[in-house]
């Protein structure tokens, strides 16, 4: 029996080694030198791609002057290795890919990938003070996906929920809740993927800079049951139909909030609830707090333009009468989609004597800003 066990163990090790060899062959083409990409060293970043067949390889990254169309040419070296070295951009998380003979491809040597809607892009981490909370903390919270019934929309839907470190070990403790909403093209996975929400909250809580809190990240597309990656067909929806105008916002307040209060140990009152959202989610944030004043005492619309309207003052006065603790607006000065609209909201709040903060950052309508905003306003919640 001992001899048989030894043989089986040896066979298992052999299979493991073969699998590792297969992965090695896949990553490095099974030929030529082992290469590293990206390589961050001494203030420089080097990108490499083994593509001997290619006639032209370019690098595209969102740190470039034009993040949408900007490219830099890579040079072909010995063994068909294409390479480029650039000055490291400022500390942040960036995305990039290669363009090989006109076709966009990901870096096969970099398994750090994030999804932006239907696009999958490689991630480049540049360490530093600004990005330190985007890395893993020592104490980790938990991220789970939950399904809930939505009678108003007519089907079950999925959300992502973050619970802080220690939630499971402290069965009597109750926690405040941040409802964190994504933008257009996103879904319930956007804030944990591109937004690094779990890492940011883990770090802030571990450092004592933020209160331990639950974070709820729903799917803000009322025609979707869940992210498209699950392969669940979206429902047909006429966006011009008035019944859909505030369908998601109503579901958020009337269905999601009660579900969370029932399923989790929450501080189930306005002082224990915050709502924040980027772009489309910022619109959901303003709509939810105008239509349902007194549900959330911490309000943070991000990169969200609001239009002038004759009724805007009356709508905002409902929030003032209900009371609130924090109204925090974040926008980038280069955000052509939301900057002017944020100034409109700022002016109306000022004219109505409603205390608030207008936080204006650099850059435009980008995740670089939204991670910064979460890292900033999360420190102000529930205090």
Each model region followed by its residue ranges:
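Bacterial Sec-dependent N-terminal signal peptides
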Residues: 1-23
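Short, intrinsically disordered low-complexity segments
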Residues: 2, 30-33
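Non-catalytic cap/lid and distal C-terminal segments of serine-dependent acyl enzymes
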Residues: 21-28, 35-69, 75-383
């Amino acid at each position: 029996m001992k001899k048989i066990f030894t043989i089986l163990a040896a066979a298992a090790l052999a299979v493991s080694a073969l699998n590792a060899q297969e992965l090695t062959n896949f990553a490095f083409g099974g030929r030529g030198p082992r290469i590293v990409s990206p390589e961050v060293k001494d203030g420089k970043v080097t990108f490499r791609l083994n593509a001997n067949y290619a006639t032209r390889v370019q690098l595209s990254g969102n740190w470039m002057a034009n993040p949408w169309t900007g490219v830099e040419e890579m040079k072909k070296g010995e063994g068909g290795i294409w390479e480029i070295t650039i000055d490291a951009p400022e500390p942040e998380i960036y995305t990039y890919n290669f363009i090989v003979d006109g076709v966009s491809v990901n870096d096969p040597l970099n398994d750090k990938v994030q999804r932006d809607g239907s696009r999958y892009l490689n991630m480049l981490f540049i360490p530093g003070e600004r990005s330190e909370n985007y890395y893993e903390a020592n104490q980790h919270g938990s991220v789970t996906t939950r399904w809930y019934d939505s009678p108003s929309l007519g089907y079950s839907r999925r959300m992502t929920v973050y619970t802080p470190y220690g939630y499971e070990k402290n069965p009597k403790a109750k926690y405040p809740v941040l409802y964190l909403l994504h933008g257009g093209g996103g879904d319930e996975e956007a804030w944990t993927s591109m937004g690094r929400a779990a890492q940011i909250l883990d770090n802030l809580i571990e450092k004592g800079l933020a209160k331990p809190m639950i974070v709820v990240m729903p799917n803000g597309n009322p025609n979707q049951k869940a992210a498209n990656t699950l392969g669940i067909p979206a429902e047909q929806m006429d966006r011009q139909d008035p019944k859909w105008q505030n369908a998601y916002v109503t579901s958020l307040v009337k269905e999601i909030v009660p579900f969370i209060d029932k399923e989790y140990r929450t501080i189930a009152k306005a002082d224990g609830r915050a709502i924040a959202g980027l772009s489309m989610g910022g619109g959901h944030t303003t709509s939810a707090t105008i239509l349902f004043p007194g549900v959330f005492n911490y309000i943070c619309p991000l990169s969200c333009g609001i239009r002038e309207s004759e009724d805007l003052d009356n709508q905002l006065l409902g929030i003032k009468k209900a009371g609130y603790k924090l109204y925090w607006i974040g926008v980038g000065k280069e955000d052509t989609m939301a900057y002017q609209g944020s100034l409109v909201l700022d002016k109306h709040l000022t004219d109505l004597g409603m205390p608030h903060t207008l936080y204006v950052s650099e850059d435009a309508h980008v995740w670089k800003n939204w991670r910064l905003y979460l890292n900033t306003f999360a420190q102000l919640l529930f205090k």
